[in-house]
């Protein structure tokens, strides 16, 4: 390795290899480079280059700039990588190009969503963020006081997984995981054929709502046997055949955690089914301005490809489908390829909701949220995927969302937000305040317990 003093700059385009497609050798290299830090097994290959460079430039005036996939500034990877970069190696980001789309000719012109991050082991007063209004277009430069790991002009905060929301809102959970080998699930055609053979099973067949069905208006069904009496099941031989197949599937698994559920083959592995809930798809296209969310009841079984907010209200719906929440999603949410991969522990539980609102503000959000739902109902033949496609989104739905956005913004502050960057600066400040308040409350609780 050359002496550090010989280099003014290190510039590179490290390999774009995601954590799920790395070889074992590459994964071992990453974990080793991170000195076996907890969670390092989920990191992309490029993160090892960042740590390697951070170690190499310690005590020097060398500046580094890497082109990387944007996964390192979103989702669970961010706090793991930048926790080390900031706190162990005292790295400061000097400039950053926020997400842009880059066509990789070496991979058949495949689109890659990238960032460029310039950093050093010393600070500078001259920092710049390059923002892309159009991710396929040109950037415009914004001067910044500080650039945090999410490439926002805000303090160096790290959004880590939390098991509970930082605000007083319903706790989000996953939908219901079948773990059944497909034997408790039915397509629309399979349901019709099944009921021809066993009409008495009708009461146990419920709509199954996965992210795909929800967004595309498709139908799927499941056997929901949670309240089935043994005597009833004995009279349903076709149902019992499927239950037997579930038992065999679970017993055949190499995972002990799956095998133990063979003792309850009539049931889904995970069962989270409140009487009413808001459904949020776990994965959705990044091209949509808003993540479509919806209301469902106890007879609509949410699949584990969705998150649910039990007993969510129109107010919760309005905030979740607002531009304010979407700005948080775009900056904090992890990705599956380029699609949003919503996380309850990182995105929802850390989201700073507007607090201490007067009754008229809450009612205002509810009224405008209801209007969004009413406009959707005008298009019964269009799926949510159609309604929220940027090219086909109806103008009245666009208008309904814009009115909701403006009102939700006013729940946070009187002045409008001039850009997404300004929204995120505000949300990070609010996040810092809320989490500081939580820390103080927890400290008081612990002190009282000691007394």
At which residue positions do the language-model features occur?
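Signature of N6-adenine DNA methyltransferases within the class I
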Residues: 2-199, 216, 230-234, 297-306, ...
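Short, ligand-facing micro-motifs at secondary-structure edges
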Residues: 98, 285-300, 318, 327-338
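Segments forming glycine/polar-rich beta-alpha architectures that bind adenosine-containing cofactors
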Residues: 5-12, 26, 155-305, 418-451
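Basic, amphipathic alpha-helical recognition segments used for DNA target recognition
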Residues: 307-349, 360-371
């Amino acid at each position: 390795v050359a002496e550090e003093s010989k280099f003014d700059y290190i510039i590179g385009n490290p390999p774009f290899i995601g954590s799920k497609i790395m070889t074992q050798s590459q994964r071992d290299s990453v974990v080793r480079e991170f000195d076996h830090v907890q969670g390092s097994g989920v990191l992309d290959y490029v993160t090892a280059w960042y740590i390697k460079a951070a170690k190499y430039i310690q005590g020097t005036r060398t500046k580094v700039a890497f082109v990387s996939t944007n996964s390192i500034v979103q989702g669970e990877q961010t706090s793991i990588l930048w926790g080390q970069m900031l706190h162990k190696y005292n790295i400061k980001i000097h400039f950053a190009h926020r997400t842009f789309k880059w066509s990789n000719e070496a991979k058949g012109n495949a689109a890659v969503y990238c960032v460029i991050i310039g950093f050093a082991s010393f600070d500078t007063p001259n920092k710049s963020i390059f923002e892309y209004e159009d991710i396929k277009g040109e950037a415009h430069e914004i001067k910044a006081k500080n650039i945090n790991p999410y490439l926002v002009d805000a303090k160096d905060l790290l959004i880590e997984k939390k098991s509970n929301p930082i605000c007083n809102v319903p706790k989000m959970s996953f939908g219901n995981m079948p773990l059944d080998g497909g034997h408790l699930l039915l397509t629309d055609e399979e349901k019709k054929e099944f009921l021809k053979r066993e009409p008495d099973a009708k009461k146990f067949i419920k709509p199954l709502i996965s992210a795909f069905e929800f967004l595309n208006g498709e139908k799927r069904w499941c056997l929901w046997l949670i309240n089935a009496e043994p005597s009833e099941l004995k009279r349903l031989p076709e149902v019992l055949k499927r239950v037997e197949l579930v038992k065999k599937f679970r017993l055949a698994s190499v995972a002990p955690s799956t095998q133990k559920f063979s003792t309850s083959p009539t049931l889904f592995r995970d069962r989270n089914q409140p009487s009413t809930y808001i459904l949020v798809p776990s994965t959705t296209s990044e091209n949509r301005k808003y993540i479509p969310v919806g209301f469902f009841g106890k007879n609509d079984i949410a699949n584990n490809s969705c998150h649910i907010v039990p007993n969510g209200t129109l107010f919760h719906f309005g905030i979740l489908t607002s531009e304010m929440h979407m700005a948080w999603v775009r900056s904090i949410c992890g990705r599956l390829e380029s699609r949003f991969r919503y996380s309850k522990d990182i995105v929802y539980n850390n989201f700073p909701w507007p607090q201490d609102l007067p009754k008229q503000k809450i009612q205002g959000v509810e009224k405008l949220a209801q209007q969004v739902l009413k406009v959707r109902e005008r298009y019964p033949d269009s799926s949510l995927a159609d309604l929220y496609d940027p090219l086909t989104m109806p103008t009245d739905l666009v208008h309904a969302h814009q009115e909701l956005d403006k009102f939700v913004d006013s729940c946070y502050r009187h002045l409008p937000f001039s850009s997404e960057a300004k929204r995120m600066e505000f949300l990070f400040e609010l996040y810092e305040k809320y989490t500081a308040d939580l820390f103080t409350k927890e400290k008081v609780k612990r002190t009282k317990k000691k007394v």
